[in-house]
């Protein structure tokens, strides 16, 4: 499905940034910063992807 391909493009972009950052913060012991960062990234991803998904539906 074309919609899934477009939405997965955004998911892979976030994943490419989130995974290395999260493992580095976890190893350095910055768990509070990690939680804050993951929360913000999820929020902004949702805010960006939801309108696109609604327009495509």
Curated annotation (Swiss-Prot):
Alphabetized, the UniProt keywords read: Cell membrane, Membrane, Transmembrane, Transmembrane helix
Q: How does it sit in the membrane?
A: Multi-pass membrane protein
Q: Which domain of life is it from?
A: Archaea
Primary location:
membrane
Q: Name one GO cellular component term.
A: plasma membrane
Q: Where are the transmembrane segments?
A: 4-26, 33-55
- Compartments where found: Cell membrane
Q: What is this protein called?
A: Uncharacterized protein MJ1621
* Organism, scientific name: Methanocaldococcus jannaschii (strain ATCC 43067 / DSM 2661 / JAL-1 / JCM 10045 / NBRC 100440)
